[in-house]
């Protein structure tokens, strides 16, 4: 067989191996699959497009996309935290998407200026307290929880999770590094227990009286709302006399290496629609990025 014939066969095989199934999208996500699978099932019903999830931790997924490059199966990268999305954009793994639908549905401050990523839900991190031990009038701000009056009354989640890191970053922006350092040191002094690995564990400790007050994402409380065991837990919106409660996002972007950027963009557009936003908020107990969505109680 001549070399030219071998070359043609090789090119054909490579082309076939890289051919993309246009009826299949793959999302690399750090979100728990059960939180987004109902939405994706609904999308398949509407469009016939199947969406496959590959789950993992955000840093490892970002690195995997970068290493896989043109050979990656990832069409979309989905994660939590604006800082993580920003890092993905800076890493060069996300495509600039110019979508009139996304730009209309998602407020400017909740998306990347170049279209690399888009917020799909909002999550507020604020104060929750045991109403048997604390009066709402005693609460005010994140910073106030560093006051000695809260000694042996505070529970917190570990700072190894991005939620507290992002909250502290926002405090540094508002209060300055030195003041924020003093606040965090005050929190540590006021701890009633060792730190917990999850917001759910913290809420259980507050409800059980191991401590009186904590800082968590609101959807964790909402997911416990139907259980009478936790009926003594109450939410307090922090810093209402100043900058307001800290709000972060979950979001996604189309990968730079996707072989199906058009359909990937259409999925993000649908996730920003009123139908998807209402479903997302109802299932996950997070807040929609689109205004005017009914989120119930």
Residue ranges of model-derived segments:
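A bilobed periplasmic-binding-protein/Venus flytrap-type ligand-binding module shared by bacterial periplasmic
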Residues: 126-133, 248-260, 279
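Periplasmic-binding protein-like
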Residues: 104-107, 123, 152-159, 184-188, 195-196, 270-294, ...
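Extracytoplasmic ligand-binding site segments that recognize negatively charged/polar headgroups
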Residues: 30-31, 37, 59, 72-210
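Short, low-complexity disordered leader/linker segments with a strong preference
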Residues: 1-24
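Early extracytoplasmic/lumenal segment of secretory-pathway proteins
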Residues: 16-87
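Short amphipathic alpha-helical coupling segments at ligand-binding clamshell hinges
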Residues: 39, 183, 250, 259-271, ...
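A ligand-binding cleft/hinge motif common to bilobed small-molecule-binding domains
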Residues: 83-87, 207, 212-233
């Amino acid at each position: 067989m001549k070399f030219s014939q071998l070359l043609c066969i090789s090119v054909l095989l490579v082309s076939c191996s890289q051919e993309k199934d246009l009826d299949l999208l793959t999302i690399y996500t750090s979100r728990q699959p059960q939180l987004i699978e109902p939405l994706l099932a609904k999308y398949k019903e509407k469009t016939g497009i199947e969406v496959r999830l590959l789950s993992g931790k955000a840093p490892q997924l970002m690195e995997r996309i970068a290493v896989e490059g043109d050979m990656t199966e990832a069409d979309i990268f989905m994660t939590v935290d604006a800082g993580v999305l920003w890092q993905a954009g800076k890493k060069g793994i996300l495509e600039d998407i110019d979508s009139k639908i996304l730009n209309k549905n998602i407020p400017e401050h909740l998306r990347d200026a170049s279209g690399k990523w888009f917020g799909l839900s909002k999550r507020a991190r604020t104060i929750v307290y045991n109403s048997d031990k604390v009066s709402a009038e005693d609460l005010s701000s994140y910073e106030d929880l560093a006051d000695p009056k809260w000694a042996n009354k505070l529970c917190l989640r570990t700072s190894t999770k991005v939620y507290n890191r992002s909250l502290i970053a926002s405090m540094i922006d508002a209060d300055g590094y030195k003041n924020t350092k003093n606040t965090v040191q005050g929190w540590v002094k006021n701890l009633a227990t060792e730190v917990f690995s999850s917001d759910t564990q913290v809420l259980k400790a507050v409800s059980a009286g191991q401590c009186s007050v904590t800082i968590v994402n609101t959807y964790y409380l909402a997911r416990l709302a139907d259980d009478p065991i936790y009926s003594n837990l109450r939410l307090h919106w922090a810093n209402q006399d100043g900058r307001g409660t800290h709000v972060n996002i979950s979001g996604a972007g189309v990968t730079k290496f996707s072989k199906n950027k058009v359909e990937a963009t259409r999925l993000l557009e649908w996730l920003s629609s009123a139908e998807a936003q209402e479903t997302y908020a109802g299932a996950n107990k997070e807040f929609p990025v689109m205004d005017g969505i009914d989120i119930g109680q």
